[in-house]
Amino acid sequence: MNVKYGLIISSELLKEKEPDGSYTFAGLTQKTFSSISEQSGQEEALSELGKRILHNLDLTENIIDFIPKVNINHYRISSSIFSLASDFSDSLIVKVSDLPNYKDILSKIRSIGFTARQNSVTLSVYPDSTNTLISDDDSIIERTISELNFHNWFFENAGFPSNASNPIIIKPLADPKIDSHKSTVECVQKFYENFQKLDEETQNRLVIQNEESGYWNAVNLFKYFHVYLNEKYDEGMTLSYSNTADDRNSSELEKGVSVEPIVNIGAFHETWKGVVPVFLWSEKTSASSKTPVDYLSNSIPDFNYGIKWECDVKKRDKAIIKFTMPQEEDKVTEEVITTITKNKYKKSRDSSRAFNALYDASSKPQN
């Protein structure tokens, strides 16, 4: 089967069996971090942040270990696993190396990489939506470069090859100033200038996706981010296709003649140079809504290309197994999930309860 389904961030199947929050990612806001620092000292705040990050990494590994059992072999990790340590938009800068459990975190990252490779699960990440390499604001560019390099640092430490098989997917998020070839070239050259400032391994992993509105529909993205950059610098970008973006922001090669999705999919597929592409598939609750449906109305079509489709649906893997295990859906829910939850993930549950209890105690107002 050419169609491979990918899970995005959370597992509803696991949450359903353990609704106490054990399978929910935990973060720490700058305000809460500062509050703990004021009440108990910065070491305590760093310790609390480190515990939450390790919980998130444990949960990530648990999901990666679980999804092959329901025939899902791709996983988009949360871009917020590291909470404040990967947030470069705040004035508070916390480095992972500052955390007291830094060595445990590194060990867990390596374990995640091993588990993914052992289970033939590929990973991707979709950084914060404010990331753009097209801007005249140096602070925006610096923040974007820092965050993209950070996600690359994770993949490097997990032991993955530095190529698009574990992509960091972003959108241009900036249109040409006017609708002309010259202005578009200036826009893309601005991107490329900043792209060159990224770590080499980050460049190898970076993938660009078409947008739901504005200039960067599928054809324009291919024309300039792949063809132009390839002709000009011998470095055309790898492109990720979004079916919703293509539907809402359709493409034309000739005026009045829309390009069919299969054509865009084929063009984008070729930019991956032999790596199985990671694309995005979704259905929304209405024509203008950004909210995905609970369940897909039909299976993802087979476009005669090997593709891993990140499946954007509210019910996550609970929706996906309707297509990956249609004859065994009830069995998966009742037997497989229960066994795995009770045995395999007890450690993650207990860890979550322990550090939440510690935080609840430390955050109570002092008399």
Question: Language-model features: where?
Answer:
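Conserved, mostly hydrophobic/aromatic
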Residues: 126
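Eukaryote-skewed repeat-based solenoidal scaffolds used as protein-protein interaction platforms
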Residues: 142, 148-237
